[in-house]
UniProtKB/Swiss-Prot annotation:
GO terms for molecular function: protein folding chaperone. Component of the N-terminal acetyltransferase A (NatA)/HYPK complex at least composed of NAA10, NAA15 and HYPK, which has N-terminal acetyltransferase activity. Within the complex interacts with NAA10. Within the complex interacts with NAA15. Predominantly interacts with NAA15 in the NAA10-NAA15 complex (also called the NatA complex); the interaction with the NatA complex reduces the acetylation activity of the NatA complex. Interacts with HTT (via N-terminus). The NatA complex is required for HYPK stability and for reducing polyQ aggregation of HTT. This is Huntingtin-interacting protein K. GO terms for cellular component: cytoplasm; microtubule cytoskeleton; nucleoplasm; nucleus; protein-containing complex. The modification Phosphoserine is found at residue 30. It comes from Homo sapiens. Component of several N-terminal acetyltransferase complexes. Inhibits the N-terminal acetylation activity of the N-terminal acetyltransferase NAA10-NAA15 complex (also called the NatA complex). Has chaperone-like activity preventing polyglutamine (polyQ) aggregation of HTT in neuronal cells probably while associated with the NatA complex. May play a role in the NatA complex-mediated N-terminal acetylation of PCNP. Residues 1-75 are annotated as: Disordered. InterPro entries: Huntingtin-int_K, HYPK_UBA, NAC-like_UBA. The keyword Cytoplasm applies. Changing residue 35 to A: Reduces ability to inhibit NAA10-NAA15 complex-mediated N-terminal acetylation, which results in increased N-terminal acetylation. The lineage of its organism: Eukaryota, Metazoa, Chordata, Craniata, Vertebrata. Its main location: nucleus. Residues 52-121 are annotated as: Required for association with the NAA10-NAA15 complex. It is found in: Nucleus; Cytoplasm.
């Protein structure tokens, strides 16, 4: 006579027998499905080349304007006259390079007090 424990053993042997190998988890199948969804979405949202060209030209124009403004600013700063004593004072007191001290003085139109205040803040 079979007891409850025997029935459970028989069921386990039937499902894991040599006829049916246990199925392996399919890890990569979900990635393929995700990729298919992404490509479908990308096809729906095609980028028009005219929009892309317009965006690139806007970015290029903005960059060229920024570069031109930077060059003009550098020309203005180069026109400012600074005293050698002021430059050396800032270099020794603030312990910064000559280029940084000169830049600070030029940005503050040669005013050593304003340059020192800006460097300490």
């Amino acid at each position: 006579m079979a007891t409850e424990g025997d029935v459970e053993l028989e069921l386990e042997t039937e499902t894991s027998g040599p006829e049916r190998p246990p199925e392996k988890p399919r890890k990569h199948d979900s990635g393929a499905a995700d990729l298919e969804r992404v490509t479908d979405y990308a096809e729906e949202k095609e980028i028009q080349s005219s929009n892309l060209e317009t965006a690139m030209s806007v970015i290029g124009d903005r960059r060229s304007r920024e570069q031109k403004a930077k060059q003009e600013r550098e020309k203005e700063l180069a026109k400012v006259t600074i005293k050698k004593e002021d430059l050396e004072l800032i270099m020794t007191e603030m312990e910064i390079s000559r280029a940084a001290a000169e830049r600070s003085l030029r940005e503050h139109m040669g005013n050593v007090v304003e340059a020192l205040i800006a460097l300490t803040n």
